[in-house]
A protein has these predicted regions:
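Short amphipathic alpha-helical segments that predominantly mediate membrane engagement
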Residues: 1-7, 31-113, 117-126
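Disorder-to-helix initiation segments
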Residues: 1-18, 22
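Low-complexity, intrinsically disordered, cysteine-poor segments enriched in small/polar
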Residues: 13, 17, 24, 28, ...
């Protein structure tokens, strides 16, 4: 079992939920993964790393710190590593469903994207 890959995938999968804020992480499958990620972080120093990720989830340096520490901790807790591995595909699919508000941006989005539009949809300036 490659703990570094599991840790990296877990942090990548949970980051969109953390960026959205507490209301998103507190429900559903994201909550389950987040609890599994936090489980091996028991010392005060380890908990500080998790708190830092909660505060600045889009900081790549912080994500890297969590990935390295999580990888080390999962080596000692293979059961949690297996649970995270099993949950990752479901969470990654859920994370693809992102709500984006683009307002007054004058930007163009291109690429192979599946976009569902709900609510008001206005093309051009109001």
């Amino acid at each position: 079992m490659d703990f570094a890959i599991i840790a990296s995938a877990a942090v990548s999968a949970i980051t969109p939920f953390l960026v959205k804020g507490g209301e998103e992480i507190s429900k559903g499958i994201g909550k389950d993964l987040w609890e599994l990620i936090k489980k091996p972080f028991q010392s005060d120093k380890d908990k500080a790393i998790i708190a830092e990720l909660e505060k600045t989830p889009d900081d790549l340096k912080v994500q890297g710190k969590v990935e390295v520490k999580l990888s080390d901790l999962l080596e000692a807790d293979e059961e949690t590593a297996e649970h995270i591995s099993a949950l990752l595909p479901v969470v990654q699919e859920e994370a693809k469903r992102v709500t984006i508000l683009i307002q007054d941006s004058k930007n163009v989005v291109a690429g192979d994207q599946k976009i569902n539009v709900e609510g008001d949809f206005i093309i051009g300036d109001k």
